[in-house]
């Protein structure tokens, strides 16, 4: 839903459970990405920054970053068949764009100011993620002896204000 809101017409679903990729084989994930790269033959791949490993606390993001970075060069060699058996048709994307919460060494920044409303609306569509983030804040508040009950209830009923807060906060960092 969020991808369609941004104008992305095709999403390839790997049917992997969120927040559980830490238990998934990096080699198996890389193999899936090799297959996708060879099948789709993208000019550009946009993914998590593998060099921001130390700055990312989400194991899913780290696993995707490393596996995809490896797949983007191994897809060009016949020694890495992916899941295919027999004849392998190597393919390499021309460009790679990385992103992250805190990138190790930024090389480019895009000004998305004119898209901020669209970005906020798309972020709002990630209801489960936003509720999980709010739950983490609520739990930390409870540990610190601070009640965030009203905040958590507000996010549960309508995530839009929280999405806007996150988008605006990320813009302030840059």
Predicted region positions:
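Short, solvent-exposed amphipathic alpha-helices that sit
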Residues: 1-6, 67, 71
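A conserved beta-strand->alpha-helix junction
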Residues: 3-17
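Metal-dependent de-N-acetylase/amidase catalytic core
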Residues: 19, 23, 27-174
């Amino acid at each position: 839903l969020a991808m369609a809101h941004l104008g992305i017409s095709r999403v390839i679903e790997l049917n992997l459970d969120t927040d559980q990729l830490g238990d998934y084989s990096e080699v198996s994930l890389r193999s899936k990405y090799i297959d996708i790269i060879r099948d789709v033959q993208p000019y550009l791949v946009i993914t998590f920054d593998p060099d921001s490993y130390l700055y990312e606390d989400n194991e899913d993001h780290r696993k995707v970053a490393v596996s995809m970075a490896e797949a983007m060069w191994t897809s060009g060699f016949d020694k890495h068949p992916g899941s295919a058996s027999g004849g392998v048709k190597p393919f390499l994307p021309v460009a790679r764009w990385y992103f992250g919460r805190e990138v190790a060494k930024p090389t480019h920044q895009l000004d998305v100011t004119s898209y901020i409303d669209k970005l906020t609306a798309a972020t709002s569509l990630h209801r489960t993620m936003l509720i999980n983030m709010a739950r983490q804040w609520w739990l930390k508040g409870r540990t610190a002896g601070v009640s965030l009950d009203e905040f958590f209830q507000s996010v549960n009923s309508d995530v839009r204000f929280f999405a806007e807060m996150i988008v605006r906060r990320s813009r302030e960092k840059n």
